[in-house]
Structures are given as C-alpha cells and as structure tokens.
Design a protein with these regions (language model features):
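Accessory, non-ATPase domains that flank or precede helicase/AAA+ motor cores in DNA-metabolism machines
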Residues: 1-65
Length: 65
C-alpha cells in the first residue's frame, strides 16, 4: 500500500503519514481528508512513498483524495 506524506495546517513543523488504497505520484499537491485526533482535517499530499518510518499497521487510512 502506498504511504501518503501529508502536510496539515498545524503549528507542528512535520509531515504525517497515512496509508492509501490507491495513490500515485500524480496525487502530489492534491488535497486529502485525513483522520487527526478526534476529528478529520484536510491536508495536502507532499509525497507518495512505498514505506514509512512507522509500522504500516499503526498508520491510519487516508480518506477522500
């Protein structure tokens, strides 16, 4: 499964990783709805990677791209 690196409008200077069923490098720059905390946020896809520094079973699934 591809891993999306997502930038969120937060006072944290880091990217957040989410798994996606279908994603490609063409999705870079697109907005995506992702779970964050108790709600959802809209972020921007910065990168599509094959792996993450976190175990894949700990990553949440991204929503609609």
């Amino acid at each position: 499964m591809p891993v999306l690196r997502v930038a969120l409008d937060l006072p944290l200077h880091r990217l957040f990783d989410y798994v996606a069923a279908e994603a490609s490098t063409a999705d870079i720059g697109c907005r995506v709805r992702v779970p964050f905390g108790r709600g959802e946020r809209v972020g921007v896809i910065v990168d599509v990677a094959a792996s993450s520094e976190w175990p894949l079973d700990q990553l949440k699934a991204a929503g609609e791209i």
